[in-house]
Swiss-Prot record:
Residues 383-392 have a biased composition (Basic and acidic residues). It is found in: Cell membrane. Belongs to the OXA1/ALB3/YidC family. Type 1 subfamily. GO terms for molecular function: membrane insertase activity. This is Membrane protein insertase YidC. Residues 402-415 have a biased composition (Polar residues). Residues 330-428 are annotated as: Disordered. Residues 359-369 have a biased composition (Low complexity). It comes from Streptomyces avermitilis (strain ATCC 31267 / DSM 46492 / JCM 5070 / NBRC 14893 / NCIMB 12804 / NRRL 8165 / MA-4680).
Length: 428
């Protein structure tokens, strides 16, 4: 761990400078040598970093949802080219390019936090060994070594020896108890975040491998925290716990205000939006207008919850406009049936004729032919009443009963025209 932390030593000075600045503020309130001053400085560092990472978090949400949408297509490509890995990779890259999706975008917040995480570990490890690091001088080093949170030094670790912990002014039991409590809290917060994501913010209409991956991570992360947590100082665990709590709150906000389409969270969100629109007759904020605009733009591709929302507005005499606003009047209202067919202005849906089978079509054509036969009788009678001069000349006598020569005239119904092949004699 020390080797990995040394790779991010270039960011140690900025991280230590930020901690010292926050410590100078909290030290005036709680005292310079207290664990609250140093602990809150670490918490403030986390908050500052996470605020700066909000744009990356938004990009992560979009990338994650795009990957969820592409999972069925990715599975088809994997099955189609399962014996050709190179072609499979080419088709995957082509799919990402066409959809404008980058698989690494969902990892950006974690990758961006890693340098700060290991830089903080480098700073606290220097405090534990009594070395000045970054902008932390001897005076600040002595103050940080005296800082305890719930009886455990911020620079102490679960795996430290009893003598090393005693030099920091604490007992090994205190360090291990505080470390265990923090690991449990970290695991619980991460488990709750993943469970909320799995149960409320996943499209229930699509079963993808992504859901299985999320379910696996829900149980893997607590085990990882237990394994790696005992090797980190208490101050780093404070950083880690604060990050998990921030992520949990951020995820709850996203689930409530920007849920995944087709999820249970979207059903609850549209129900709240429907009550507000029916009560006030309009959308309240830019975010609500963006949601309504996206629903209108989907057309027949709307899911079940979105169709219910549009139909509820139509029944109330309201109409969702293409710009996300809500207007009145049935002329522009858009309603949808359960299969996604749109109807405008509450007009009844035209019934489509049922498709007939082949036997039904044949019986219908035979019946129509039978009804048309009596109609041809008057025509034949009228032809017989024509004058004699209008009739064609009769054939000469003797030629009426004379059969015509040629093989074509001898062909009867059921026979093949042309020279007939003699039958072979039967063998007895």
């Amino acid at each position: 761990m020390d080797t990995i932390a040394s790779l991010f030593s270039f960011i140690t000075i900025p991280v230590s400078w930020v901690i010292v600045q926050f410590h100078s503020v909290y030290g005036k309130v709680f005292g310079a040598d207290t664990g609250w001053a140093w602990g809150l400085s670490i918490v403030s560092l986390v908050i500052l970093i996470r605020i700066c990472l909000i744009p990356l978090f938004v990009k992560q949400i979009k990338a994650t949802r795009a990957m969820q949408t592409l999972q069925p297509e990715m599975k088809k490509i994997q099955e189609r080219y399962k014996n050709d890995k190179q072609r499979q990779s080419e088709e995957m890259m082509k799919l990402y390019k066409e959809s404008g999706t980058n698989p690494l975008s969902s990892c950006l917040p974690i990758l961006a936090q890693s340098p700060f995480f290991f830089a903080l570990y480098h700073v606290l490890n220097g405090i534990a060994t009594g070395k000045t690091i970054g902008v932390i001088d001897d005076q600040l080093l002595a103050s940080a070594r005296k800082a305890h949170i719930f009886g455990a030094p911020l620079a102490a670790k679960f795996t430290d020896s009893a003598d090393k912990v005693t030099q920091l002014g604490a007992t090994l039991m205190d360090v291990r108890v505080v470390t265990a409590i923090m690991i449990v809290l970290m695991s619980a917060s991460q488990f709750y975040t993943q469970r909320q994501l799995m149960t409320k913010n996943v499209d229930t209409t699509v079963k993808t491998p992504f859901m299985q991956q999320q379910k696996m991570l829900m149980y893997v992360f607590p085990v990882m925290f237990a394994i790696f947590g005992i090797n980190f100082p208490v101050g780093v665990l404070v950083y880690w716990l604060t990050t998990n709590v921030w992520t949990m709150g951020q995820q709850m906000y996203v689930i409530r205000n920007n849920p995944t389409p087709g999820s249970k969270a979207q059903a609850a969100f549209l129900e709240r939006l429907q009550k507000h629109v029916l009560h006030h007759g309009k959308t309240r904020s830019r975010g609500q207008r963006a949601v309504v605009k996206a629903i209108v733009a989907k057309g027949r591709d709307r899911n079940e919850f979105e169709r219910k929302f549009i139909n509820a507005l139509t029944k109330a005499g309201l109409a969702a406009q293409s710009d996300g606003t809500i207007g009145k009047g049935e002329a522009t209202a858009v309603a949808e049936t359960e299969d996604g067919t749109q109807t405008t202005g509450g007009a009844p849906r035209r019934q489509q004729p049922k498709r007939q089978s082949k036997s039904q079509r044949q019986s219908g054509s035979a019946k129509a032919a039978g009804e048309s036969e009596p109609k041809s009788t008057p025509l034949s009678l009228s032809k017989s009443d024509e004058p004699d001069d209008a009739k064609p000349a009769a054939k000469p006598a003797g030629g009426a009963n004379k059969p015509s020569t040629g093989t074509r005239s001898k062909a009867q119904s059921g026979q093949r025209k042309g020279p007939q092949r003699p039958k072979s004699p039967s063998k007895k």
